[in-house]
Amino acid sequence: MEEERILCEAIHYNDGNIHRNQPKEIESGFIIAGYRHDTCVYIKSLINSNLREVKQGFLTNKKRFVDGYEAFEIAQKAGQILDPELAKEKGKRLLSEDLW
């Protein structure tokens, strides 16, 4: 079985509606994915929508949306973190600059 890896940054925008083709754990709202979180924010600025909640996180190759803490564990296990010692000093929360 393939090891789970981080694919890209993502933000969960919860507008209270159910949308098709979202990651497994997203019950309502939608995901915008991008190379960096600010790319996701910019794309969202082009869309008009009422939001209840906004969460930054990451998408994995297993079609899951995970927060920065779970992403840190996944990326660490997969050897994706550029500077593991620096990442540990900042805390066990993955940031986009830890990957790219």
Go through each PLM region and give its residues.
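Linear-motif-rich, low-complexity cytosolic tails and juxtamembrane regions
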Residues: 1-56, 60-100
